[in-house]
């Protein structure tokens, strides 16, 4: 049963934190085409409509193939600025007040786009967003798991000068790309090095991979947050562990439906995980490719699963509690969330 218009409005206007957003995955077809034209890049699509037609993927790999083709238009600092500024505009419109944004340097350095170009453009846009909108943000550098451990180490070393400068907003590392055949332990030594450097640790696990990958991300990589994690529902002991530890799951329902992790949003495990006491949070993943930014994901999920106002309050609180913000900042945002939801009860 669809939620009421009143609840939909409360959800849309609620403060939120977005913790699972790939900045390259926010590249809309219109901007992709504009950047291709600006940079003289030939795309394998004749029109914006052809790109949108290509969005009928069947699995994670077919999505990734399109994702990396789209990234080929990103060549200059201004390109990264424009992409990031476009994401921020969408996030601000959805009442996202804080975002911890993934970026994939290997996608760009492999194309001979220097690290300073990637980080420089993204950070400049985030600095402008903070000044213009009070938009709070941090960056999480993600390693591509289909590449080698050695490549990840090389990327970490190249990024260290940027990581060590707080002005660049990089607070942690993550692990993304193809799960199949690339278990967490492949990057155990890389994550140990990152932990020694004092970086926050997250990893994609339990999306297309099994519940065991969630366990391995926790035990071997020692992550503080699990990105996706929906296959945890297949292991009752793991669900109990996640609920007890309050290690957050950054769940992306429209992404899961689009990539056939679940055949239909009504089959999604989010409500089961939430009802079991897990620290579930709700995000957009790659919104340009999966058909929705934050509010679209929230509203679609609430309509499909019949979630309540109390669930919305919990999910909004969880998003800030699971963030890597300083405790005093978390407290301010949690208070804002409580005021918003209690005003409507």
Swiss-Prot record:
Positions bound to substrate: 286
Question: What is any one GO biological process for this UniProt entry?
Answer: adenine catabolic process
Q: What is this protein called?
A: Adenine deaminase
Protein task: Catalyzes the hydrolytic deamination of adenine to hypoxanthine. Plays an important role in the purine salvage pathway and in nitrogen catabolism.
**Into which family does the record put it?**
Belongs to the metallo-dependent hydrolases superfamily. Adenosine and AMP deaminases family. Adenine deaminase type 2 subfamily.
Which organism is this entry from?
Answer: Ralstonia nicotianae (strain ATCC BAA-1114 / GMI1000) (Ralstonia solanacearum)
- Catalytic activity, per the record? adenine + H2O + H(+) = hypoxanthine + NH4(+)
One GO cellular component, as annotated = cytosol
Q: Listed GO molecular functions?
A: adenine deaminase activity; zinc ion binding
Pfam families xrefs = A_deaminase
Q: How is the cofactor bound?
A: Binds 1 zinc ion per subunit.
Which chain positions carry the site (Important for catalytic activity)? Answer: 228
Active site: residue positions? 207
* EC code(s) of this entry: 3.5.4.2
Q: Does the keyword Metal-binding apply?
A: yes
Q: Name the UniProt key words of this record, in alphabetical order.
A: Hydrolase, Metal-binding, Nucleotide metabolism, Zinc
Names of required cofactors:
Zn(2+)
Domain of life (superkingdom): Bacteria
Q: Which residues bind Zn(2+)?
A: 20, 22, 204, 285
